Amino acid sequence: TFGVTIEGLKDASTYYVRYEVSNRWSSKMIDEVSEFKTIPYTIPTVQTSEVSDVTHSTAIVGGVITENGGQEITERGVVYSTTPNPTSSNGTVSSGSGKGAFTCNLTALQDGTTYYVRAYAVNAKGTSYGEEKSFTTKAITIPIVTTSSATNISYTSATVGGEILDDGGATETERGV
């Protein structure tokens, strides 16, 4: 038995091979023709991971590229939108290149809004998307404040105060009594 590796073939192509056997006195072409077809390149296979750490304006999501389709992954990341089935024409956060797991930080999101997100991967054959996930950012609400009873009461003054239990998701801009 013998074998030879043929390099530089084109994907998704049919090839025909005939073998030649030779020794130092003669050579003989084998009449039998073998046929084979090379595997076609495909777009990558990518899965969208679960969305985590959702706040009023941020979230973390990513994906896993499980198959590169026979070619180098040149870009990967997530696409997101407030409408279903986001594509690269919507919001995009890139996370480098290559096969494997990755994460992306989504920032500057609107509070109390539902977003749809999908992981994506790009190779020379094209772009593929993972399954769609959705999440809703936390809504900004009115702060929750408690007031304490007045202390140190005199004829002309008293000490009063309170505690902010929940800022409602927004940065405190003012406080007072």
Description of each model-found segment:
Residues T1-V177:
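Short, surface-exposed linear motifs at loops/turns and structural transition points
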